[in-house]
Every structure is written in structure tokens, then in C-alpha cells.
Amino acid sequence: MKYAAIFAAFAMCFPVCMAQGIVDPAAVSVESKVETAINELCDIQVKIVELLESAKDKESADAAAEELFMVIGRVQELQPDVQQIRSCDAATQQRLVKKLLQATIAVGARKKAVGKSLVEHQFYGSEDLKDAVRAML
């Protein structure tokens, strides 16, 4: 209940702050765009590990590779938005970089284990999966 009151107060004050020039709308939209891109990159890291873990034979490895190439394409699409982090204030930059780093660390052990397994199984004979993994490096 108290969060609803805080949110309502913020929602009422925000347009006033923008009108008085206290908050730059361009800065807010850039920060929002960067944060959205960073959040998506965090989700993508988990998705990559899940796709790699789904490879159990050649057929599933080929299917995972196809999806991985789409994910890689999405990461490339997000790059311009992520690069705008430079225009955010230092505190925002630090917060967003920390968030991305924590997401990377959180999936790091799983990614290493699944990578080792894929190498041991020679990518289940899937050249597509091998190419997708190379493209991510």
C-alpha cells in the first residue's frame, strides 16, 4: 500500500519536474532505453545457457544453433542502445554495469559446464552449433 502511494506521488511530480526543467526528458528516455537493453541482455545470457543445455543430440543441437543465431542477431541490434550508456550519469552507468556483470557471473558456471560438455560430445556432430558458439566468442 505504501508503495502505491509513493508511486502515485512520483507520477504526479514527474511531469512538473520535466516542465520546470529539473528532469531532462531526453536523458530519461536514453536512460530508459539503455536500461531496457541491459535488462534484455541479462535475459539473453540465461537464454543462451538454456539453448546450449538443450543440445542433447544432433537434431536438438541444430535447433539450438538456429535459435542461437537469432539471439546473436538480437544482441547486435541492442548494441547501439547499450553504447548509449556513456551518456548516462556515473551512478546510472555503475548501476547498469553492475547489473550486467552480476547476470554474467550468475550464469558463468553453468555456461562453462555446458561448454565443456559440448566440447566433450563434439557438439553432437552439429557444425551449425559449433559455428554459433564461435560467433558468440
Name each region found by the language model:
Residues 1-4:
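Positively charged n-region of N-terminal signal peptides that target proteins for export
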Residues 6-15:
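Bacterial N-terminal signal peptides
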Residues 71-137:
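Compact alpha-helical subdomains of small soluble proteins
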